[in-house]
Structures are given as C-alpha cells and as structure tokens.
From Swiss-Prot:
The chain crosses the membrane at residues 1-21, 32-52, 55-75, 82-102. This is Spermidine export protein MdtJ. InterPro entries: Small_drug/metabolite_transptr (IPR000390), Small_multidrug_res (IPR045324), Spermidine_export_MdtJ (IPR023740). It holds the Pfam family Multi_Drug_Res. Belongs to the drug/metabolite transporter (DMT) superfamily. Small multidrug resistance (SMR) (TC 2.A.7.1) family. MdtJ subfamily. It is a multi-pass membrane protein. GO terms for biological process: glycine betaine transport. GO terms for molecular function: amino-acid betaine transmembrane transporter activity; antiporter activity; choline transmembrane transporter activity; spermidine transmembrane transporter activity. Its main location: membrane. It is found in: Cell inner membrane. The lineage of its organism: Bacteria, Pseudomonadati, Pseudomonadota, Gammaproteobacteria, Enterobacterales. GO terms for cellular component: plasma membrane.
Length: 121
C-alpha cells in the first residue's frame, strides 16, 4: 500500500515541476521549459493514475491538486517574485483545511469475509 502513496508523492512532485517549468518557459528563451513541462505533466498524470488504484480518487486528487497549488504558490513567490497577498494566504489556509477534512473523512473499505459453507446433513 505504501507504494501507492509514494506514487502519489511522485505525481505531486512532477506536477509542481511541470507547472513551474511552464512559468519558467514563458519568461525565458528557448523551448527547454516547454519540453520539461510536457514531460513532467505527463509523468504526473501517469503516477496519479497508478496511485488511484489503491487510494480513493477524491483523496488522491485533493492531495495532488491541493499540495501542488500550495507549493507552486510558494515557489512562484520565491523563484519568480510573485506577490503573496493576505487573500492568497487565506485561500491557501482554507485549501489546507479542506485537504485535512477530506483525508480525515475517508474510511478504509473492509473486504468482506469469506463465508464458511455449512452444509446440512
């Protein structure tokens, strides 16, 4: 089961890298950023598709998108000098609270136990 969480982590990391390289490509010369973006976003969806085999889709997607937005915003401020207003901070805080609620509200599905065949004599 841990492998699926690792795959989700890889999906998040490649999504962040792909989205940041999209911004980098738009402010720099050449096509390297666009190629990196294409590869990373493609890998992100591949990793996510494997992760949802054992992780609930709602949880996986919320974590993928939410953590991605959180780190993309943080790195955009650090790398590209984008602004971080009080309203953005409030939105990110709400996002994190939503992710926590979705994750904590998800129950693990139990597998049905096998019935024992009690034949009548």
């Amino acid at each position: 089961m841990y492998i699926y969480w690792i795959l989700l982590g890889l999906a998040i990391a490649t999504e962040i890298t792909g989205t940041l390289s999209m911004k980098w490509a738009s402010v720099s010369e050449g096509n390297g950023g666009f190629i990196l973006m294409l590869v990373m976003i493609s890998l992100s969806y591949i990793f996510l598709s494997f992760a949802v085999k054992k992780i609930a889709l709602g949880v996986a997607y919320a974590l993928w998108e939410g953590i991605g937005i959180l780190f993309i915003t943080l790195f955009s401020v650090l790398l590209f000098d984008e602004s971080l207003s009080l309203m953005k901070i409030a939105g990110l805080t709400t996002l994190v609270a939503g992710i926590v609620l979705i994750k904590s509200g998800t129950r693990k599905v139990r597998k049905p136990e096998l019935e024992v065949n009690h034949g009548a004599v």
